[in-house]
């Protein structure tokens, strides 16, 4: 209600304050034309100059031409897909590998219901959620490291 209420201009105290400039932003410098006309274009042109300068000084090198007949021995996905790739690569039945990947979001959706009795926000006071988080983090890191290795060393990470 206070936002929509208009000032009472018939009040002499209010008119005296407005006459002195109170109630308005009378300090600093105005945005037009100082900021919008002078400072913003300088910043925009400076940014463009930096980008063009970096592109000229350090151009991106062109790679070799694509050769469809020379494929690498093992094609790896992007780094963020390594754990999923490792599951599909190691599990013998591909349908089971896809089922394992659908269990991950289902398991994450069950965590709040498993620990619904515990209303604490401190993660150290929520043992089930903390255990699921740590297990998932370590499993994801383990699978990601294993995906970057050859298939015979991927499960043991070459340690034994």
Swiss-Prot record:
Keywords: Electron transport, Membrane, Photosynthesis, Thylakoid, Transmembrane, Transmembrane helix, Transport
Regions crossing the membrane: 36-56, 95-115, 128-148
GO MF annotations, alphabetized: electron transporter, transferring electrons within cytochrome b6/f complex of photosystem II activity; electron transporter, transferring electrons within the cyclic electron transport pathway of photosynthesis activity; ubiquinol-cytochrome-c reductase activity
Membrane topology: Multi-pass membrane protein
One CC-aspect GO term: plasma membrane-derived thylakoid membrane
One Pfam family cited in the UniProt record for this chain: Cytochrom_B_C
Entry superkingdom: Bacteria
GO biological process, one term: photosynthetic electron transport chain
Signal peptide interval: none
Compartments in which it is found: Cellular thylakoid membrane
Subunit structure: The 4 large subunits of the cytochrome b6-f complex are cytochrome b6, subunit IV (17 kDa polypeptide, PetD), cytochrome f and the Rieske protein, while the 4 small subunits are PetG, PetL, PetM and PetN. The complex functions as a dimer.
Family per similarity comment: Belongs to the cytochrome b family. PetD subfamily.
Role description: Component of the cytochrome b6-f complex, which mediates electron transfer between photosystem II (PSII) and photosystem I (PSI), cyclic electron flow around PSI, and state transitions.
Record's protein name: Cytochrome b6-f complex subunit 4
Species for this entry: Synechococcus sp. (strain CC9902)
Gene: petD
């Amino acid at each position: 209600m206070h936002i929509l209420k208009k000032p009472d201009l018939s009040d002499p105290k209010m008119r005296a304050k407005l006459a002195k400039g109170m109630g308005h932003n009378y300090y600093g410098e105005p945005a037009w034309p100082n900021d919008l006309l002078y400072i913003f274009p300088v910043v925009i042109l400076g940014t463009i100059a930096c980008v063009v300068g970096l592109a000229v000084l350090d151009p991106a090198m062109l790679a070799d031409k694509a050769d469809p007949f020379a494929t690498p021995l093992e094609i790896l996905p992007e780094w963020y897909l390594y754990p999923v790739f490792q599951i599909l690569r190691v599990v013998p039945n591909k349908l089971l590998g896809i089922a394992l990947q659908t269990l991950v979001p289902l398991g994450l959706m069950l965590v709040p219901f498993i620990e619904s009795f515990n209303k604490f926000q401190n993660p150290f006071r929520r043992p089930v959620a903390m255990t699921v988080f740590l297990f998932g983090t370590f499993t994801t890191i383990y699978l990601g490291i294993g995906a970057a290795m050859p298939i015979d060393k991927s499960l043991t990470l070459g340690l034994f």
